[in-house]
């Protein structure tokens, strides 16, 4: 999951009006749980719990495979083999034309494969469950932890890179689909597990561009995205705009700074102004806020400049991420450009480069009862999945999954057995609601 943004929120709570995503506070202190567990319970007893559960075993095996973005092949092959052994027809979609080492996994029940080319068929996949198999670095091995005073297996903590983001969602979605298909073999389900979500979404973009897998009109009336949402349904997430502010000057000896032009001195006023844009009212040139998402936030995440303290710096640059609470990314670009021009007096040594794609806030569906409702600040593959219109109306989009974003990219990434198991039930509830809609 792309960084920024509560642990287990009760899935039994009825739907409520969404609250702004910022600020959110963790609901449990996972670092202390991982760091302070003792060894009164043997590792064998913890392993026995996992070995006895197909869900937990699959999750363990997937997390144990390193799949940092760009190196997803082994994890993809594992998921593809598992699905094929459970009566799915699996399509490995290459993400680049240069190599087939990186691929998305698209799978449908074998009994329905003949209808894949029939986008209007009642047996073609109409409900899509999707998440991503890539993770951020570094790889952290799978491990199990239990509080010495807690004998409830549901509270066992499963730690490691990807346990939360997003291999927990991948595992729960697969086992939810298997449960549904066992009871309803003709359920029109499709599974899509993509690469590259953490680094720009090239996997989902490749799927979107496939006329075979993503035909027009769309065969899907429901898409269920898997990300760590603390088992809440997400009413939407903020938009995103990324850019670089750069400045150039002229190098000179720092003892005679008037002989040069400092790129850092030139860029500082621009960065100071950009850093405040989320706090400035729109009528005064700032970025917009909304009741649903709160205020737009700005993060200057990286800065570079100069070569030594005794040299007037000739170059400087900074990377900026804006989480948009309202408006479009095009409108936000204009706000940023005007702010930089105004504060620098139009200094042509300072430029803004919008090299990354952006998108506005993503509103999502929350019409299935029995879930807590929230909004989040982080980005997802939701805007990267571009489905074609359907003649019968819009496609419903849901965002749900186990675990919390607060640990998703940290060295304390972990979730509990209970959260993973509850996610299976939650995904089944979302699938069944979609099946009921299509039958009515």
Swiss-Prot record:
<feature type="active site" description="Proton acceptor">
    <location>
        <position position="197"/>
    </location>
</feature>
<keyword id="KW-0964">Secreted</keyword>
<comment type="similarity">
    <text>Belongs to the peptidase M20A family.</text>
</comment>
<dbReference type="GO" id="GO:0006508">
    <property type="term" value="P:proteolysis"/>
</dbReference>
<feature type="glycosylation site" description="N-linked (GlcNAc...) asparagine">
    <location>
        <position position="353"/>
    </location>
</feature>
<dbReference type="Pfam" id="PF01546">
    <property type="entry name" value="Peptidase_M20"/>
</dbReference>
<dbReference type="GO" id="GO:0046872">
    <property type="term" value="F:metal ion binding"/>
</dbReference>
<dbReference type="InterPro" id="IPR002933">
    <property type="entry name" value="Peptidase_M20"/>
</dbReference>
<feature type="glycosylation site" description="N-linked (GlcNAc...) asparagine">
    <location>
        <position position="149"/>
    </location>
</feature>
<feature type="binding site">
    <location>
        <position position="165"/>
    </location>
    <ligand>
        <name>Zn(2+) 2</name>
    </ligand>
</feature>
<keyword id="KW-0378">Hydrolase</keyword>
<feature type="signal peptide">
    <location>
        <begin position="1"/>
        <end position="16"/>
    </location>
</feature>
<feature type="glycosylation site" description="N-linked (GlcNAc...) asparagine">
    <location>
        <position position="87"/>
    </location>
</feature>
<feature type="binding site">
    <location>
        <position position="198"/>
    </location>
    <ligand>
        <name>Zn(2+) 1</name>
    </ligand>
</feature>
<dbReference type="GO" id="GO:0005576">
    <property type="term" value="C:extracellular region"/>
</dbReference>
<keyword id="KW-0732">Signal</keyword>
<feature type="glycosylation site" description="N-linked (GlcNAc...) asparagine">
    <location>
        <position position="372"/>
    </location>
</feature>
<keyword id="KW-0862">Zinc</keyword>
<dbReference type="GO" id="GO:0008233">
    <property type="term" value="F:peptidase activity"/>
</dbReference>
<dbReference type="InterPro" id="IPR036264">
    <property type="entry name" value="Bact_exopeptidase_dim_dom"/>
</dbReference>
<protein>
    <recommendedName>
        <fullName>Probable carboxypeptidase AFUA_6G06800</fullName>
        <ecNumber>3.4.17.-</ecNumber>
    </recommendedName>
</protein>
<feature type="binding site">
    <location>
        <position position="165"/>
    </location>
    <ligand>
        <name>Zn(2+) 1</name>
    </ligand>
</feature>
<dbReference type="InterPro" id="IPR050072">
    <property type="entry name" value="Peptidase_M20A"/>
</dbReference>
<dbReference type="InterPro" id="IPR011650">
    <property type="entry name" value="Peptidase_M20_dimer"/>
</dbReference>
<keyword id="KW-0645">Protease</keyword>
<keyword id="KW-0325">Glycoprotein</keyword>
<keyword id="KW-0479">Metal-binding</keyword>
<dbReference type="InterPro" id="IPR001261">
    <property type="entry name" value="ArgE/DapE_CS"/>
</dbReference>
<dbReference type="Pfam" id="PF07687">
    <property type="entry name" value="M20_dimer"/>
</dbReference>
């Amino acid at each position: 999951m792309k960084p920024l943004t509560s642990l287990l929120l009760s899935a039994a709570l009825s739907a409520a009006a969404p609250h702004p995503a910022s600020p959110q506070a963790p609901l449990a202190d996972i670092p202390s749980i991982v760091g302070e567990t003792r060894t009164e319970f043997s590792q064998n007893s913890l392993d026995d719990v996992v070995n006895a559960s197909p869900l937990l075993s699959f999750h363990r095996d997937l997390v144990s495979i390193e799949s940092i973005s760009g190196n997803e092949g082994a994890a993809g092959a594992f998921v593809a083999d598992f699905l094929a052994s459970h009566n799915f027809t699996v399509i490995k979609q290459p993400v680049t034309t240069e190599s087939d080492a990186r691929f998305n996994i698209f799978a449908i029940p074998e009994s329905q494969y003949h209808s894949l080319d029939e986008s209007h068929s009642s047996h073609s996949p109409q409900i899509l469950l999707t998440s991503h198999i890539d993770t951020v670095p570094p790889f952290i091995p799978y491990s199990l932890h239990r509080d010495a005073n807690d004998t409830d297996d549901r509270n066992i903590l499963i730690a490691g890179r990807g346990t939360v983001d997003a291999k927990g969602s991948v595992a729960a979605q697969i086992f939810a689909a298997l449960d549904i298909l066992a009871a309803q073999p003709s359920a029109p389900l499709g599974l899509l597990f993509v690469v590259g979500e953490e680094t720009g979404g090239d996997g989902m973009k490749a799927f979107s561009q496939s006329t075979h897998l993503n035909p027009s009109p769309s065969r899907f009336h429901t898409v269920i995205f898997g990300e760590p949402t603390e088992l809440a349904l997400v009413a939407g997430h903020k938009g995103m705009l990324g850019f670089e502010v750069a400045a150039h000057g002229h190098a000179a000896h720092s003892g005679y700074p008037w002989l040069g032009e400092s790129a850092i001195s030139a860029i500082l006023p621009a960065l100071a102004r950009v850093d405040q844009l989320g706090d400035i009212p729109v009528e005064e040139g700032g970025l917009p806020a909304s009741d649903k998402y709160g205020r737009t936030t700005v993060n200057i995440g990286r800065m570079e400049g100069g070569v030594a303290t005794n040299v007037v710096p000739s170059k400087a640059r900074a990377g900026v991420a804006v989480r948009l609470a309202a408006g479009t990314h095009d409108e936000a670009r204009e706000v940023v450009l005007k702010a930089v021009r105004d504060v620098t007096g139009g200094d042509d040594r300072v430029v803004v480069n919008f090299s990354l794609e952006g998108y506005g806030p993503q509103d999502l569906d929350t019409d299935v009862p029995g879930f807590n409702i929230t909004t989040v600040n982080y980005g997802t593959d939701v805007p990267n999945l571009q489905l074609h219109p359907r003649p019968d109306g819009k496609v419903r989009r849901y965002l749900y999954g186990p675990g919390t974003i607060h640990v998703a990219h940290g060295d304390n990434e972990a979730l509990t057995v209970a959260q993973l198991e509850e996610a299976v039930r939650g995904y089944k509830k979302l699938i069944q609601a979609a099946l009921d809609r299509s039958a009515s």
